[in-house]
Amino acid sequence: MNLHEYQAKQLFEHYGLPVKNGAVCQSVEDVDLVLAQLSGGKWAAKCQVHAGGRGKAGGVKLVQDVEEARAFAEKWLGQRLVTFQTDKLGQPVNQIYFEETCDIDKEFYLSAVVDRTSQKVVFIASSEGGMNIEEVVQNSPHLLHKVTIDPLFGGLPYQGRELAFKLGLSGTQNKQFTDIFMGLSRLFLEKDLSLLEVNPLVLTPQGNLVCLDAKISVDDNALFRHKDLLALQDLTQNDAREAEAEKFQLNYVALEGDIGCMVNGAGLAMGTMDIVKLYGGKPANFLDVGGGATQERVAEAFKIILTDPSVKVILVNIFGGIVRCDLIAEGVIAAVNEVGVRVPVVVRLEGTNAEMGRQILAESDVNILTAQSLQQAAELAVNAAKGEH
């Protein structure tokens, strides 16, 4: 789950990290009231979306007065911001974050991610922060410095000092950086984050380090013990189908193909998409119905897939381990009838009572194409998408 910048900075402030004062508005009428809470005569105006690249897309601007702030809010509120990290439709802008400004002498980059190989958290820092960090990663990887922290012990002061020295910071700035490193380390571990990014972390002419931007992603699997973070979730930033799928504990990710995929198990779902591509097709989605593929969940899965107008065929690939394939077959038939599916449906069943399941499908009056293997299922689905069924 992603947080907005203003939400991330509220967490930063709670952990004693240096941020500038800011406030959020949700309408043009709120701009004057919001700016009255801030000092200074100019502010940074930032569209709040769950995507990077806002600056290059025009979603971040330095506004010189209240009138310019109003104009920025009027331009963006209710619109969609398209960046290199969004799809072609972009993300809806429902909030503008106004923040006090500061002069900048130097920009740094600082982030933390989970390294699954070492089963530890890796902090990454660079002396080249700002909007072009992607180019630094690609063209100058030697400018990236890393330290690994053990989740059992957390970040240690010497690690912060080590990173600070590599960034060319000494004296007071070294201590400030170490304090920021320690605070971010506590935040990352205590809140079960999967990603934390400060870009840029800036050095002001007065010699102070300030977190000018903040990006946080929380591990979805840990949200059950972080009700405070769950309350910050903004479902408007999710694909509408993905949000609907969450209600029924379905894992759905929208793609841009025309073959809808319904599979039980994430690994099998990825394998199914791979083989569809191998046979020349394009998956319209990733959809994992999980181990408990009940009739209700299968019906909801069909409904969600069919909300995508580009879907020309649905491929159902079920391995009956925990669930029996005969029950799945009956569920698929009932779901197809309930939903009123009007596109071809290809079903491949394997595992417990698979033959019985295929027989139930064959004897039904529902127009379902059955496959004996995953290869045959992919071929049938690709041909059906081409209108050759």
UniProtKB/Swiss-Prot annotation:
Principal EC category: ligase
Record has Ligase as a keyword: yes
Amino acids binding substrate: N264, G321, I322, V323
Any single GO CC term annotated in Swiss-Prot or TrEMBL for this entry: succinate-CoA ligase complex
GO molecular function, one term: ATP binding
Role, per record: Succinyl-CoA synthetase functions in the citric acid cycle (TCA), coupling the hydrolysis of succinyl-CoA to the synthesis of either ATP or GTP and thus represents the only step of substrate-level phosphorylation in the TCA. The beta subunit provides nucleotide specificity of the enzyme and binds the substrate succinate, while the binding sites for coenzyme A and phosphate are found in the alpha subunit.
Protein name as catalogued: Succinate--CoA ligase [ADP-forming] subunit beta
Protein source organism: Haemophilus influenzae (strain ATCC 51907 / DSM 11121 / KW20 / Rd)
